[in-house]
Each structure stands twice: as C-alpha cells, then as structure tokens.
C-alpha cells in the first residue's frame, strides 16, 4: 500500500484508535457478526495468528469462559484468555502438539498468508497449500458441529479448496468483508457445522 493510501485507510486508523494490532480485526468482527463462528465460552484455534488481531477478536467473542490458542511462525504477544505458540502449519507434528495443548476446538480461524513474492501464480498456489495444511490440523482438533473460517486468495485453485471444505461441513460460504481492500483478491471461506 502506498503511504498516502495508508493515511486514508479507515480500518487501519480505527484499529490504532481501538487498540487492535491490525486492521484485520475488523474482518473477523464482521464475519463473526454475520455467521457466529465464535460464541461465548468457545475454545478457538487461530492458525497464522501474528500479529494477533484475530486473537484479540476471538478472545473477546469467547469471553472469560473461552480459550484461544494462536499459532504462527512469528511470535504473537499473548492476551487474557489467549495464548500463543510458535509453529509451522506444514509441520506434520503440529496437529498433535495443538491437540495436546488445546484439546477440542469449537472454532478454527485461519488468516494465513505466505510471504508474497509478487508472482501471483506462485503466491496463490502457496496460500492454498497453506490452507490445506491448516485444514489437516483443523480436522484433528475441531469438534463435531464446530465452525471455521479461512482466508482464500481467489484464483485457479480456490474452487477446489472450497469443494474440499464443502465435504467436511454442513454449510460453506465465500464472502469478502467490507474491511478487505477492494483491490485485494482475498476472500473468506466460512465453514459451519463440521461433520467430524
């Protein structure tokens, strides 16, 4: 984003004013308001959690009786009712580590993005690959009837990923929150009612 655009970015300004770690908080707030992905008392797994704005929203939605565990390659500062750990979603052992630490989750939220190279085909394929890795972890920890949301770079492989997730959930819906930049190719795949 150009510096001039950043100054005009309404959500970035609001995030700073309201104490969120990034503008991404408003994406999850909007999605949760529309689809009730996270409710009071929920146990939530946040994959790709850094810098932690989704952890902030999840901890608020889950409330005092809820638990949030964030996982990322980078460190994300912990909050009340939200812990974080370093981990790579592509590491085969991470699912077991998360299951031991968290138990069953009521919701899995995933805002993963690769280091963007500028080559759209490569970046899109890499992001979808990360989603498949996250979905494997989700399959290990998400409780039956649980919910999930995944960032998806729209493109060649997005429909295949949506179809894959559609087999695991009662309902799936692709949507673009108002807080997403208009020029961004990102969509969010909301998945409700895990069939376990």
Swiss-Prot record:
Pfam families: FtsJ. Keywords: Cytoplasm, Methyltransferase, rRNA processing, S-adenosyl-L-methionine, Transferase. It comes from the Archaea. It catalyses: uridine(2552) in 23S rRNA + S-adenosyl-L-methionine = 2'-O-methyluridine(2552) in 23S rRNA + S-adenosyl-L-homocysteine + H(+). Its EC number is 2.1.1.166. It is found in: Cytoplasm. The active site is at 151 (proton acceptor). Belongs to the class I-like SAM-binding methyltransferase superfamily. RNA methyltransferase RlmE family. Specifically methylates the uridine in position 2552 of 23S rRNA at the 2'-O position of the ribose in the fully assembled 50S ribosomal subunit. This is Ribosomal RNA large subunit methyltransferase E. It comes from Cenarchaeum symbiosum (strain A).
